Amino acid sequence: MSRRPNFGGMGMGGMNMQQMMKQAKKLQAQMAQEQENITAQEFTGKSADDLVVATFTGDRKLKDIKIDKEAIDPDDPDMLQDLVIDAVNKGLSQIDEATQASLGKYTKGLM
């Protein structure tokens, strides 16, 4: 009868499964806390000359949008559209950057 080698319950560099699960839960809790911190923040994107300002919550919900009356030109609605798009995209980019800075330390080895 062949016998399996006994590694003393160790694997993965000397860490047993119970220790690995404990470490994974700890990391998961830390990531959840980081995400909660991001969600609690507000992020603001501004167009050129601050004519349009878009404010988001950290969970990517548009909270407020302010449009300066100088941005409203009935003869050029495309300009206002471009300003809104610019402000919104900048606000969303801020959320992405904050998320990457905060959670990237946990995920960089996984990709």
From Swiss-Prot:
Record keyword Cell membrane present: no
GO molecular function: DNA binding
Keywords: Cytoplasm, DNA-binding
Subcellular location: Cytoplasm, Nucleoid
GO CC field: bacterial nucleoid; cytosol
Signal peptide (UniProt feature, chain positions): none
Pfam families the record matches: YbaB_DNA_bd
Presence of keyword Acyltransferase: no
Protein's job: Binds to DNA and alters its conformation. May be involved in regulation of gene expression, nucleoid organization and DNA protection.
Subunit organization: Homodimer.
Family label: Belongs to the YbaB/EbfC family.
Protein's UniProt name: Nucleoid-associated protein lhv_0401
Species name: Lactobacillus helveticus (strain DPC 4571)
